[in-house]
Amino acid sequence: LDYYHFVSARWLIKPEITLETFKEKMKQVLQNPFLGQAGADASERSAPQRFLIVGLGESGYAMAKWCLVQGAFVRLADTRAHVELLTRQIDWLDDLQKLGLVDTCFESSDWSTLLDGIDVVGISPGLSPIQEPTFTLLSECQKRNIAVWSEIEFFARGLYALEALAMAAEERYKPSILAVTGTNGKTTTCALTAQICERAGKHVALAGNISPAALEKLLSVITKANNFIELPEIWVLELSSFQLQFTYTLDPTAATVLNLSQDHLDWHGDMQAYAAAKARILGKNSVLVLNRDDEVVTALFADEKESRKVIQFGSDSPVDIDSFGIERDPRAGGIDWLVWAEPDEATLASELEEAQEGFIKHKRRKKLDAYEKSDELRIKRLIPADALRIRGRHNALNALAALALARAAGLGISPLLHGLREYQGEAHRVQTV
């Protein structure tokens, strides 16, 4: 499966490049959208072609559809009987069959047979790795050296393939990926991040646990776009611990674990495993957006703060350059302000120039130390917490996290504040009735 079979790939070909030339170019760049990052020599690797998708939920449907569109072989399995499927799931199954799905198995239990001839298992996030029948499935995969991917792993590889395809066509597509997880506040923070980035003039795609599935959204934007310019500039992803468990190559521009408390222990087994799954959100090159109020989160990333760019937020005054916090003005009965430790003008001008070129160079901690220690922090008041339409101190922290994520994508503060004021919140979350 060569990557030129990618859905709607023909619009990605420059007019002066013939299809034959483009095919030859693509063979030198990567084999197909399942190889992952294009940094390694794709010609030396064998891309997976045969997939077992386990679970007909939203993610399972998205994975199966993505693979079928790419021309890969798909086997779909679900532990439920066909008669137990909901109307929506029956519609999904009909859609997949129209795309060429013929190999299905319901009330699945014989994994040894289902895994025959399979290169990769795509697993739905609702299936716990420590519970049967998933535990037996994973054990069998390990014995056979069969990879297990989440839907987000498929998404990451598809996005990297799209970036490589742009490069082959002498174009540039390098979107920012802003990834959010945590026990609480994920949906609000993601929706708010997407809105303020859009308010700053960016084309934003919001997907993941918040719905739609990331792969479904990726397929949709590719199908609708006529050129690279029409693709999202920023992807905002809400990711659960379930989705992160089998994700390996996602490397977000910035990532945050908003907070951590005991949750989903029946799925993970214990708090340590739960926290470890959450920590997978941080990629090799990601800016860490860190909640300094949460002791569990700060301990989880204690070893990361010296090796990468960190933007902190919390309910007290900022402690580092470019970090965020809350300060109280004792006048007028006490007003809480969202505040920012503003970088110097030279730094801001440099970031603006880099952002206009389509990328941000995140300085390592060693390069920041001299500046941080040489001057007092310049604390800038942004907006009163009461100016937010979403209420509660927890939502003020969600707003700070959104600002930090947008800053990591190279966006200036001023247009983001308009988006903060306008955000009305999500349904059934601290609503006035």
Region annotations inferred by a language model:
Residues 74-78, 205-206, 312:
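Short beta-strand "acidic-cap" motif of Rossmann-like dinucleotide-binding folds
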Residues 111-112, 171, 225-266, 301-385, ...:
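Extended acidic/charged loop-beta regions that coordinate divalent cations
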Residues 402:
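Flexible loop/N-cap segments at domain edges
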Residues 389-391, 405-433:
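Gly/charged, well-structured mid-domain segments that form the phosphate/adenylate-handling core
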Residues 56, 79, 182-183, 209, ...:
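Cofactor-binding loop segments of dinucleotide-utilizing enzymes, especially the Rossmann-like FAD-
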